[in-house]
Curated annotation (Swiss-Prot):
It is found in: Cytoplasm. It holds the Pfam family SepF. One of its GO terms (biological process) is FtsZ-dependent cytokinesis. Keywords: Cell cycle, Cell division, Cytoplasm, Septation. Its main location: cytoplasm. This is Cell division protein SepF. The keyword Cytoplasm applies. It comes from Lactobacillus acidophilus (strain ATCC 700396 / NCK56 / N2 / NCFM). Homodimer. Interacts with FtsZ. Belongs to the SepF family. One of its GO terms (cellular component) is cytoplasm. The keyword Oxidoreductase does not apply.
């Protein structure tokens, strides 16, 4: 009751407060009508479990012995797996043919192929990033390129 008298003294009454509350709620309702219910950007939220269960990057090791093994190497690249290829058990002419085939596959996928050792190559699909060079460690003799 004392607050009512004080409110009237300052020109505020309970009726005015109710009117202000009604105006406030109608303004909020109008603003909420503009936004769809699914307007929250869910791309910014990442589940911790999804990061743990996501597919892991894989590296496959191959020692081809015949030219037809190149198809298996290419299939792994198409499945977004990096491939380390050791040609030490092949003739140089067959190894060159496989390197040419894999180079074409890697080019088509926008990946990379690098020589990482004597008769050893690394072929990666586009989602892999390789840093650094070990060309100083590779012998200067060029058997396959």
């Amino acid at each position: 009751m004392a607050f009512d008298k004080l409110g009237r003294f300052f020109g505020i009454s309970n009726d005015d407060e109710l009117a202000n509350d009604e105006e406030y709620t109608t303004q909020n309702e109008e603003n909420n009508e503009d936004l769809p219910l699914n307007s929250i950007n869910r791309d910014n939220v990442v589940s911790i479990k999804s990061g743990l269960n996501s597919s892991k990057s894989k590296i496959v090791l191959y020692e081809p012995r015949v030219y037809s093994d190149a198809k298996d190497v290419a299939q792994n690249l198409l499945n977004n797996k990096a491939v380390v290829i050791n040609f030490s058990r092949m003739e140089d002419s067959s190894a060159r043919r496989i390197v040419d085939f894999i180079t074409g596959t890697v080019y088509t996928l926008n990946g990379e192929i690098q020589r990482i050792g004597d008769k050893i190559f690394l072929a990666t699909p586009p989602k892999f990033v390789t840093d650094g060079k070990i060309s100083d460690l590779v012998d200067k003799k060029d058997n396959l390129s």
